[in-house]
Amino acid sequence: MKNFTTALYKHATTDTIVSGFMTSIGSRLYENEAPEGAEFPYCVYMVVSDVKDWQFVERFRDILVQFSIFSSASGSTEVKGIYTKLLTLYDECAFSITSNTLIWMWRNSLTTMRDEVTTPAGTLGVWHYSVDFDVYLEDT
């Protein structure tokens, strides 16, 4: 799993010119959770599930990975722009993974919401886009 999450992060940091994703979140991409007091906007990614699969002698992994985009902008323009850049970066993409071959990665679903977050400065309205991707890997 570590090889996959490392490759996922590396893909974001090496493809900044094409998608602009990392620039749009100020390079604030975190695995599993953001640090307390993280500046907006930011994105958190995590593996939701990792299911082993096989066909005869080939071994596969069916992974669901979730990206959560957070923006404190008053309107939804910023979070929508970040979402578009995330799709450009990861939907039907290709990248190298040590010990695995990426068969596919595509967007599964999008859930949009507006949350209220309590900060030392008070309550803040935050846009939260939760984007799920299906990933299929072959073990090598």
Predicted regions and their residues:
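Short, conserved turn/kink motifs that form compact alpha/beta structural patches or helix kinks used as
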Residues: V44, F60-R61, F70-E78, N108
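Short, acidic Gly/Pro/Ser/Thr-rich loop/turn segments
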Residues: K52, E138-T140
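Short, solvent-exposed beta-strand/turn "edge" segments of beta-rich domains on protein surfaces
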Residues: W54-F60, P120-L124
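Extracellular/virion structural assembly segments
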Residues: F56, S72-C93
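Oligomerization/assembly interface segments of phage tail-like spikes and tubes
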Residues: R59-A73, L86, W127-L137
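Acidic-leaning, charged glycine-interspersed low-complexity segments
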Residues: T88-E138
